[in-house]
Amino acid sequence: FNKFIVENHSQLGKIFLMKLLYKIPLFSFLFIIAFETLYASEVNIYTSRHYDSDESLYAEFTKETGIKVNVISGKGSALLERLKAEGKNSPADIFFTVDAGNLWKVQKEGLFSRINSKNITSIVPKNLRGPNDEWVATAKRARVIFYNPKKVSESEIKNLSYEDLAKPEWKGRIAIRSSSNMYNQSLVASLISNLGEKVTEEWAKNFVANFARKPQGNDRSQIIAVANDEADIAIANSYYLGIMLSRSKGDEQLEAAKKVKMHFPNQQNRGSHINISGAGILKNSPNKDNALSFLEFLLSERVQNYMVNISFEYPVLKDVLPNPIMAAFGTDFKIDEVSVASYGELNPQAVKLMDRSGWQ
């Protein structure tokens, strides 16, 4: 699939052999049936996920089903433009990405088909699916507060909410990445959904005034800033701490991760903001049955166990436990149950609001 030259040669070979065998009707018929079956046994995935572990996931799917997985990787925005350009001729079956906002963008363009599977809709909560089941969550992540216990007291952190971070006592103490980051845009969109735009904008202005430094770096950079005393607290996705504690990013990041603790905000009211990894079947998919099989595979108990143990995300299935590293921080924390689809719907307002608040 992502080796178009090989694919084109295969297509030419198919035509040649069909012509060659034309005069042998029965053999030709059987050959064509076998060839078409083999040719159809694939699923083409466009993904913006950046996890090396996904390759072994695809290999396991092929081993279990016999369906070959072809992958095109890239940034979500670039893949969306590619899908639009390909139109009805697109070979893509699945769009697989992180952040509900990215799924919403594809949905808005009308590029998804509805997922018609009771096996999926019966196990994935409505707030973790597209409004009309255009896409579905495959894993969850929380956007939480990381803090330096030497700088932040237990009384300060105990019932801390996102809203509290706009208070004067946090001035010069907060690290977070830029407003161009989709994770932050979705966080602000969730606040708009819960609090309204006016209240959220006032919050954002005061929140920005409390930054310890100009927004910079990725999520792990924010955690490292707390470990290095450049900030007292940071906002980042939960799984990054798991990655760092696993030593997969080296001893330096392991030592940084050991210096911080993780806090789930808003446990006294609506719960912590969550986002998702998710996927949908594309409208022009040439292999819809295979695509559905892949989604059902991702949401099986065995694969959910595998995924969360590799990615350090949280499972969608309630009977699956997270990686032990993440479970050590708690498994029964309260989550905000607002529809994650609202992150995409409210994204334009969130981006404009962040700009008005001075969030760089």
Functional labels for PLM-detected ranges:
Residues S277-E337:
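Mature extracytoplasmic/periplasmic domains
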Residues R141, A204-V208, R213-G217, L254-K283:
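Periplasmic-binding protein-like
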Residues S48, D52, G74, A78, ...:
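Extracytoplasmic ligand-binding site segments that recognize negatively charged/polar headgroups
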Residues G101-K105, I233-A257:
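A ligand-binding cleft/hinge motif common to bilobed small-molecule-binding domains
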Residues F112-T121, W135-V136, E163, D251-H273, ...:
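Short beta-strand->loop
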Residues P25-E36:
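Bacterial N-terminal signal peptides
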Residues P324-Q360:
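Extracellular/periplasmic bilobal clamshell ligand-binding domains
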Residues A40-K105, Q360:
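Early extracytoplasmic/lumenal segment of secretory-pathway proteins
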